[in-house]
Amino acid sequence: MTMATTVSKGKVTQVIGAVVDVQFEGVLPAILNALETTNNGKKLILEVAQHLGENTVRCIAMDATEGLVRGAPVSDSGTPISVPVGNATLGRILNVVGEPIDERGPIAATEKRAIHQKAPDFQSQSTESQILVTGIKVIDLLAPYSKGGKIGLFGGAGVGKTVLIQELINNIAKVHSGYSVFAGVGERTREGNDLYHEFIESGVINIDDLEKSKVALVYGQMNEPPGARARVALTGLTLAEQFRDQSGTDVLFFVDNIFRFTQAGSEVSALLGRIPSAVGYQPTLATDMGQLQERITSTKAGSITSVQAIYVPADDLTDPAPATSFAHLDATTTLSRAISELGIYPAVDPLDSTSRLMDPQILGEEHYNTARAVQGILQRYKSLQDIIAILGMDELSEEDKLTVARARKIQRFLSQPFDVAQVFTGSPGVQVPLDKTIASFKAVVAGEYDHLPEAAFYMVGDIEEAKAKAAKLAAAAA
């Protein structure tokens, strides 16, 4: 790719929403180059998307274009959008082009990195499987996460994706020596603000000495133009790649929400005049997703474990956007509205959530057998629900009645109080070690706690807490 040695100058010829056409006199800037202009006294970055002929390029604006006029001068930066990386970004909030938006002064980074990078080659990738313990029972037992894997949180609106992501950051940042990067892609500004202040309160961001913080934040919220929302995930990933390569640790990369990345790509695609494909999405949907996801990987230097919230439009998992994401994931955590309606949080569907690690050679026989036994009881309960709805519990055999009773206890035992939800629930959050999770569920499946009431299993940690709650309930009833 040849770059112009002198800075190419051009002028704006057309503005259609977030898409801007720029005509150049001499050498055309390369595709994906960043162009600079000013709008209302503020710097505006444009990214080259198409060469149209007649020395004109079509660009996507990374900020609002209201007030931009034809004839405005534009200069080519000669490189793609580059953002500050390294420890100077810790505890800070950046926007898509790497500018600080937390009102804490400029970022003193010595190094910048282009947001468009190639995925690591085969030789440098690492392939070993190791479980990443989250302290959340339902995840660790039934759909465990792998270090350096990609995890998808699927769910419709309002079933708890963001709260689960916040709890994962909270749990892992506390027990984890590595760094986290959080990319807020097209989600609510209020949530981004709340998250920032929660990080400060919990000590994940050290406001007195920012470089001792454990997380860097990159935001491109709902009110941003589609160009910013389509690129902000790449900005966050670029920060995560730098932490992985420089420190050689396990970096956690959180994206909330990957669907908005697709949605922004679809808006940009329509503005660029591409013919839409299925359900109105961009024809390059799989390519866009692949370019992002293939960069999220473990190398011999370190690993990036990514947790991605994936909004499911109208709760339809066959929609092209969530369906395209499925292909890239190692584990899926599906949040179910039916479970959230029962008041069971986290509302993880124990039968619909999957993991590549569900293998006795990776997890060990005890963990694998316990998980499969739990799923077996829940599956049997699910198949009996139609009979119960039509004929009632009395028509079931004694064995089935016992299965239903155990399944209802297991269902409640899969709930857990969260640290980040303490303001809603009033009860302090708990993290349950993996060995206690396995032992507790093994005992429940074996029928050792058939004598405890259902309510004792709701919103507790391990089985000892359930026993203590049962004793408290018995004392209150006496």
Curated annotation (Swiss-Prot):
Instruction: Provide the reaction this enzyme catalyses.
Output: ATP + H2O + 4 H(+)(in) = ADP + phosphate + 5 H(+)(out)
Where in or outside the cell is it found?
A: Cell inner membrane
Q: Which InterPro entries match?
A: AAA+_ATPase (IPR003593), ATP-synt_VA_C (IPR055190), ATP_synth_F1_bsu (IPR005722), ATPase_a/bsu_AS (IPR020003), ATPase_alpha/beta_chains (IPR050053), ATPase_F1/V1/A1_a/bsu_N (IPR004100), ATPase_F1/V1/A1_a/bsu_N_sf (IPR036121), ATPase_F1/V1/A1_a/bsu_nucl-bd (IPR000194)
Chief localization class?
Answer: membrane
The entry's cellular-component GO terms read: plasma membrane; proton-transporting ATP synthase complex
Q: What class of enzyme is it?
A: translocase
**Disulphide-bonded residues:** none
Which GO molecular function annotation, any one, does this entry have? ATP hydrolysis activity
- HAMAP family, alphabetically? ATP_synth_beta_bact
Tell me the protein family, please. Answer: Belongs to the ATPase alpha/beta chains family.
Purpose of the protein? Produces ATP from ADP in the presence of a proton gradient across the membrane. The catalytic sites are hosted primarily by the beta subunits.
Name assigned to this protein: ATP synthase subunit beta
> Which organism is the protein's source?
Fuscovulum blasticum
Q: What is the lineage of its organism?
A: Bacteria, Pseudomonadati, Pseudomonadota, Alphaproteobacteria, Rhodobacterales
